[in-house]
Amino acid sequence: MNAVPLRQSEPMPQGERVVTILGATGSIGQSTADLVRRGRGRYRVEALTAHSNVAELAKLARELGARFAAVAKEECYAELKAALAGSGIEVGAGESALVEAALRPANWVMAAMSGAAGLKPAMAAAGRGEIVALANKECLVCAGEAFMRHAAANNATVLPVDSEHNAIFQSLGAGRREDLVRIILTASGGPFRTATREQIENATVEQALKHPNWSMGRKITIDSATMFNKALEIIEAFHLFELKADQIDVLVHPQSIIHGLVEFADRSVVAQMGAPDMRTPIAHCLGWPHRIDGPATQLDLAKLTQLTFEAPDPVRFPALRLVREALVAGGAAPTVLNAANEVAVASFLDRKIPFGGIARLVEATLEALVAKGTAKAPQSADEALAVDHTARKTAAALLPEIALKAS
């Protein structure tokens, strides 16, 4: 049984929607908070969490009337407690407090904590059997099989926040699941869409951080430039929608207007369109199964001069080849790919390896660990974190070799 609903018509729960935002001070969390503000009277905020931005967390908690606020860094506890003194808001710190926030009585949880730290809280939220708006990639990339099984077993509803997966989710409502042929994820192509292999190999940090369409953090902007973001999205779609690897295609769409397409047996292709603005999929998830007013710019089709598509080049962008190989290998290979990529991106941003070295380090780590039999799929958050740790250590050990080959 899939935890992602196949139809859009389930009734809205009666009364106000009780909301928890895990990762409230990040871009996704802030956008969610803004939508909650706009819908005053329809939402009540139960809990908010942050990594270490105590000032912003305290401000949001007071403004939104949260009942509980938690910070990941335990050393920030005293600061948060002081910032919320006299407010009546309960305060916590550390991993256990993040899990407590996820377990609080909310019927809609935004899981937007970044990185592996968001895995256990998201698992906890799914275990409550309510709606989880999933923005944390690690849940699906590192522990997709375990997470979706856990969500389904507890009758949780998982709504994809990522723009491409949200587009697929919306488009799937146009037909029956058994009539689905394939899905198509779109990619902007990033800053190096038309660059040569040599230009890509030697790209600078500054060049890689110039995304043509989206305003994002440094890590995801580099992932867009390498197309590892699309590789990770393939893994996410594989688990979210219970697809076979050959049912997931990618098209480069430079305008970033069409976010995802679904093809059915009668050869109808249904697509979701919108301005490149993450507030649209967030609003869709917050209002689901209904629609709420969103703040994104209205799409003016008359002003669009063209919508173009290109097949991606797996030679210039080996991430797309590596993710296919990881899915074929199965087990923990996707977890290894994600961890190695994080080490590689951090090393590139620190100017320790060239841009082309990112994919080479990921491939070398996959070869080292999958060959050693580290291929059992994680069955829990702890197992996923253990594989993640091993892969990071392996990637770090291989780093000097990758750097040496580039010199």
UniProtKB/Swiss-Prot annotation:
Pfam families documented for this protein: DXP_redisom_C (PF08436), DXP_reductoisom (PF02670), DXPR_C (PF13288)
Annotated family: Belongs to the DXR family.
Pathway assigned to this chain's UniProt record: Isoprenoid biosynthesis; isopentenyl diphosphate biosynthesis via DXP pathway; isopentenyl diphosphate from 1-deoxy-D-xylulose 5-phosphate: step 1/6
UniProt: 1-deoxy-D-xylulose 5-phosphate binding residues: K137, S163, E164, S188, H211, S224, N229, K230, E233
Name under which the protein is recorded: 1-deoxy-D-xylulose 5-phosphate reductoisomerase
One term of GO molecular function: NADPH binding
Binding site for NADPH: T25, G26, S27, I28, N53, N136, E138, G217
Binding site for Mn(2+): D162, E164, E233
Source taxon at top rank: Bacteria
UniProt source species: Afipia carboxidovorans (strain ATCC 49405 / DSM 1227 / KCTC 32145 / OM5) (Oligotropha carboxidovorans)
Needed co-factor(s): Mg(2+); Mn(2+)
Reaction equation(s) it catalyzes: 2-C-methyl-D-erythritol 4-phosphate + NADP(+) = 1-deoxy-D-xylulose 5-phosphate + NADPH + H(+)
Keywords, alphabetical: Isoprene biosynthesis, Manganese, Metal-binding, NADP, Oxidoreductase
EC number of the protein: 1.1.1.267
UniProt-listed GO biological process terms: isopentenyl diphosphate biosynthetic process, methylerythritol 4-phosphate pathway involved in terpenoid biosynthetic process
